[in-house]
Amino acid sequence: MKIVTFFILSLLSSLVTFAYAQKSFQVTVKGKGEPVYLFPGFGCTSDLWEETVAELSETHECHLFTFAGFGEVAPIEMPWFSTIKDDIIAYTKSKKINKPTLIGHSLGGTLSYWLAASEPELFRKVIAVDALPCSAALMIPDYNGDKIPYDNPRSQMMLQMDEAAFKGMNVQLVQFMCKNSEKHQTILQMMDKTDRKTYVYGYIDMLNLDLREDIANIKIPVIILAATFPDKATVEKTYQAQFAKLPGVTIHYAENAAHFVMYDQPEWFLQNIKQNLK
């Protein structure tokens, strides 16, 4: 009886730990080999990596993340972004995953920088896809570091936007961020499932994160696969400015590619991912 009781208590304990570790994300593991974490960009799910994982899972253990409020994953309370970061660190330590490589698109790439700067010894390498340490500096003219409150006129407008207007806004965004029109519907199907509060407040979390100084703490290799649309010279200038504190960063520029590099230049993208995982 004592053995049975001990077994049940141990099982319940493991279930509680498992649930806590993943409250801000859902993760699926595919393949065997050296561990790789794949983080999607804002509003996207792990489906973003379908073609990539079809190849990588043959040689690597791929941990596919979908964040809270995206796809079918239940939303969480704010702060959203920092909770995800802390939970991924806890997940890595509790599962004793040995130095995974971080691959992240957009917000997922920014998250990768944050993780590597926060825990310099926990990860092996960062491969970021069109991601900056400070998105606000790119998007807000004369950005001075001021924090954006959750409750502001623009966020209220977006929360009150009807579904048709919300989808219309996303259509315009996707047309700009992906040159491959055959993939537009794939992206929109992911974005349309996003919890609205997460979409609005989670984006504010991302804009309020400035890692331009923190990246100096990163001790592992950082490789960036950057888009070049709409203007390569401007893109290069932006990356050089934002990574001034990490001079050892390696940046590869994808010609004729917008933000969704994996869709606009799939062969180039996969070749660079596989090469940099060696």
Please provide the spans of the model-predicted regions.
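Conserved HGGG/HGGXW glycine-rich cap/lid loop of the alpha/beta-hydrolase fold
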Residues: 29-74
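Hydrophobic, aromatic-rich cap/lid helix
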Residues: 185-211
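Active-site loop/oxyanion-hole signature of alpha/beta-hydrolase fold enzymes
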Residues: 63-103, 107, 271
